[in-house]
From Swiss-Prot:
Domain of life assignment: Bacteria
Pfam families hit by this protein: PdxJ
Name by which UniProt lists this protein: Pyridoxine 5'-phosphate synthase
GO molecular-function terms, A-Z: pyridoxine 5'-phosphate synthase activity
Origin species: Synechococcus sp. (strain JA-3-3Ab)
Name of the top EC class for this enzyme: transferase
Upper taxonomic lineage: Bacteria, Bacillati, Cyanobacteriota, Cyanophyceae, Synechococcales
UniProt main location, coarse: cytoplasm
EC annotation from Swiss-Prot or TrEMBL: 2.6.99.2
Amino acid sequence: MLSLGVNIDHVATLRQARRTVEPDPVAAAVIAELAGADGITVHLREDRRHIQERDVRLLRQTVRTHLNLEMAATDEMVAIALEIKPDYVTLVPERREEVTTEGGLDVAGQVSRLSEVVSQLQGSGIPVSLFVDPDPIQIAAAAQVGARWVELHTGRYAEASSEAQQEAELAQLRQASQQAIQLGLRVNAGHGLTYWNVGPVARIPGMEELNIGHSIISRAVLVGLERAVREMRQAMGLSSGVGPA
């Protein structure tokens, strides 16, 4: 069944803009869960530009759905994950100069390293997802290194400048999902998804979870986080949530 993972990185972005203590990502996670989020996603970047290690530790103690830790495949991040033990890890590419993650992980180009990292994490009971472009070579490599999931990068779909281009990108996502499932992988997706473009991705056969952050947090500034999460669930074709209206 399709689920919604709410990425709360940009709650921390707002906090870090003033180097203060609020808004608190941990409090945001509680509100998101009460509004119907099926999981909480955070990206602990090497430069600590938004989410801090302390946030991840507190979230591990407080999240009642599941905690998805996005991170680079570095020794430092692997050590943190092995200590904190999130419900699962999503390995993502990372460059210090980027504003946000700009593309999928090159799994095919680093099979040996990623096999080692996946083995370390999953050997300690932490399932691993790989954030990849909807590319047959990368999906095959994800299966080769032993990952449990792929998270399909929906950026090109989200940024398509015409209806024809968007439909072509959507077709690639559908094909990638089908290939992943045939290889025994589970399928999530995310990046650039909004209230206006999420519907077709939500309807891709086999899709398990959509991880969405910026659009929800942007909407929350105007209408509040609880309503923003409920509205995203509705846009995905899910029930509006579990708490009071």
